[in-house]
Amino acid sequence: MDKKKLVILALALLVILGLAAAQYTPWLYWTLLPKEQADTIIGEASGETALNTIIDINGYNRDRLSEEYAGPFLETQIIIKKLKEYGLAGAEIVSYPGGETWNGIKGELWEITPRRQKLASMRDMVPMLASGSSTSDVTGELAWVGRGTAAEIEAAKVEGKIVVTEGSLGAVHNLACLQKGALGVIGISMSKPYFDPLQMGWAGIGGGRGMRGGPGQPAQAAQPQTPPPAPPKPKFGFQLPVREGDILKQRLMAGEKITVRAQVESKQEKYKMENVVAHIPGTDPNAGEVIFSAHLFEGITKFGANDNTSGSAAILEAARLLNTLIEEGRLPKPKRTIRFLWGPEFSGTSLWVRANKAIMDKTLCNINMDMVGEWLSKNQAFMCLMRTTYGNPHYINDVMENYYRYVGEGNRERIQNRSGFNKVPVRVVAPFGADEPFYYSIETHYGASDHEVFNDWGVQVPGVMMIAWPDRWYHTSGDLPDKSDATQLKRAAAIGAAGAYTVANADDNLAIKIAGETASNGTRRIGQQFVVALETLNGTKAETLADSYKSARTYVEGAVLNEKDTLDSILELATDKAAVGNYILQMKKTIDAVGNANLAALQAHMEATARRLGQKPVVIALTELEKKAAKIFPKQTAKVTAEGYQGYRKYIDGIPAAERAKYPYAAEVSSPTELQLLINGKHSVLDIMKLMDAQSQRKSKVQGILNYLQILKMAGLVEM
């Protein structure tokens, strides 16, 4: 086929794919599971039950009482009690050593003169007392310091006074109290003040916090010297909501002399890391597992109905509904085990994962729920699915997208159906929840929650996150059950349960169905990357045309590599590896064909761009370093996963700094974490660069990647 015909074919294929993505069939709504099974799961899901769990755990901003620290915490008690009530197998509390944490006992702030009135009380609202506040009983004059800059604090002569600020409570405390002699600090919460003037962020103060190296990055080497002095003891901090704080601010700015008395009682409490686990056993213990996760604790003294009591309640409801349907025979027993894990965010989840390496070794994927219960329209939010990165390619992305789409596209009225009785084809609404569309979005990867424990290089269990965003009451006193919605909770529990059950009970036929859907979605994703590539060329200049074209091709080439890796992941579901593998091979050929069509069309666009810029068409040629990189296929060693979550870090940290310095990489590697995950023995170094560049604004360089790989080789983590 000559070049002209290939370009015409490519453009025709792109048009067809574009129409497929844009024109949804208003008469067809499909699920990977048989529709009757999917609808049974949806019907059994109870958003009201999940909402009641949120209210039981976090009905208000409560003060954690001292007796709870002896264990178990109230949250733990409620989850384990319900699991046993629901009949889940293996329901137990698994505790690990914790440490000490601050606990506020009393916090009262009263104006003494010229008026007698209460300004703040921990009894009224727990976040009014800043965490970290020391036991105090002081009387002092108030001093207004504005945003709390060094100049404002200096001008206010704050020694012996209690400062009032609308800046950062912690930063102003450190400067005004610990350095300039102020008695304490009162902060006017500026957390979304124009949306909700009564909410306050969960704020804290302290005498300074130590710094540690990030993942894969060593902390500063210890030097033989006298230990540094202990940080100064913190004083105290109070918070006022904007509505009340503005009154105090205006009085102070008008020159009024105000004296207050602050009474604080606090103590340090020892605590344990409490995790709760349970499972629904599969019929084949060797077939693998699916694991749900949700952090039950957002710190020890901070609470939130949406963040993340809602995620904990939603996976509990997923556990209840699946166990009920399976025990009653309304769903077949799954082939694979479905496991559920609740714990402290990162800190507790990671301890359980490290302690259960045998389970992790056979776990296929993770579904993490974080902030899934909020009323979407009230928050102007979308229910997002955060996919894995290219470093953890997995079909769980497409399985979950299938149910997001089924609920999202089917649960809204379409003009094409206006004359029929079922104007909303797939109505998923809780009896006492919001009757509104399911606003959803399929997103690229985002971390910052417990799925990152599973995605870690030392664990390598691909994890996705379900999360609603934005959240107008995030990390504030306003994160209460009145912002939650039974309909949203029903949808979250049903989608998660359907996704997990699809994987848990997949046979060869369902594996083939998943592969077909993944390939279909993959053509659309490659098409999206093609648009990014076009825009890269559209925005280029004559002097950057060659580099832009190279980058543009990388967007498509990297996407093609990822889609084929994703298809390969499906083979773990198969019993007849040959038959399913052959089907997957055909789907990979489809992906290659789509990729080649895109690249042919991209070349045509490059040539048109070159004419527009008065340049000759670009001819791509590999540099000598790139040719070398194309022949190197790094492979990870057993040490990477031997000790589970973050266990590999000690080998990197153990390389002398002088040796590491010989291989600089920080300026030339967009994400060392992602680079690690892309090492699989099949990707060349050049492939790794393409996979990184295709999903990042910041571009990597071959030499930087080679340098980082050399460090990993010295650590015994990589062979090449």
Spans of model-derived segments:
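Noncatalytic luminal/extracellular "stalk/propeptide" segments of secretory-pathway proteins
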Residues: A22-D39, G43, G47-E48, N52-E159
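Long, charge-rich, low-complexity alpha-helical segments
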Residues: A667-M720
